Amino acid sequence: MDEWLAEFIKRTILKLPFSETATILKTWGFLTESELQTFTLRYPKEVTATEVVRFCEARNATLDHAAALDLVFNHAYSNKKTWTVYQMSKRLESENDLFDASEFKLQFKKSIHAVSKNVTINFKEFGEALWIRIAWGTHNSRPNQYKATFAVYHSQTPYVFITGLGKACQPLMCQALVIASKYSQIQEMELKSRCLESLKDIVFKRFNQPFSSHHSKPHEKALTPNIVDPRVTYENMREKDRVYHLTCETFGEGPLPKLELASYKLETMFKADSAMSGNLTAVNEPFRCVVKFSSPHLLEAIRSLAPAGIAEAPISTLLSCIPHKARNSFKITEKRSMHPSSSQPTNV
């Protein structure tokens, strides 16, 4: 086994949490059951990693085996990366609509290798998802195994979740995906998150849907604590009930997909009367700014704003529409009419 390959396997093992090392190695499936039984997890992790490499050298591990280990690791810890959603469209007519994983892999590799031979491609299926790992190289250098691109594709859906894709490799990657999946177009959606499962929940519409306004209001018993002292009155009970009901109409009552960021790019022209007109209003270029909201769980944070009294209910649709429009990046511009002073805000 080459020295660089042994080093790559060793570094992958060192990234594993100590308590999960045995589980990951078992999922990897390269080491035999007897080898796993004789294997001893020891501190420091360097000792454990060296022992794994020794087993791999004895069994002549290849790059494919190392890539499989990397796939298992990134599947288990997918939240360590930021994922972007791509949507394909205009599916090509085919006599057989059933997904053939072998044909997909063949066409994907063929499409990329037709342009660049110095690329390693590996696949691994996890349930209904096909994971793809691509390490890109150049004419002068071998594929960089430490900066691989990962793509997750669910057959019979037009969505692909990608992380680690550089701009230079994006056209080739997108071309390979549409050819292999038998679509004709693909575009990047304005939707990103570290939580891969939450992105799937959004585009597959698996998250809790809010109930319509014609539903009966929640019982007050569920909204408020028991009144210990009957002399205590809740003067704002009606307002709390209204806020709770509007919040449920907007976001539902169940758990929401986990997103960490939402950004809004504002583009508008300065407008002022003649007394206030100056250099700014004379400039034809629009004013631009970016507003970003961040939180470990942004949608839950937004849902809690009105009940906490921080914002009025209902919450602005610019915030509440995130899961339904399947995007967390917006551009807000103005609809300009023929009259230069007439404009209306709009969001894209």
Curated annotation (Swiss-Prot):
Checking Pfam families in the record gives: CENP-N
Q: Which GO terms describe its biological process?
A: CENP-A containing chromatin assembly; chromosome segregation
- Answer whether the UniProt record assigns the keyword Hydrolase to this protein: no
Q: Which UniProt keywords apply?
A: Centromere, Chromosome, Nucleus
A GO cellular component annotation here is: nucleoplasm
Q: Where in the cell is it found?
A: Nucleus; Chromosome, Centromere
- Function, as annotated: Probable component of a centromeric complex involved in assembly of kinetochore proteins, mitotic progression and chromosome segregation.
Q: Which family does it belong to?
A: Belongs to the CENP-N/CHL4 family.
Q: List the protein's name.
A: Centromere protein N-B
Give the lineage: Eukaryota, Metazoa, Chordata, Craniata, Vertebrata
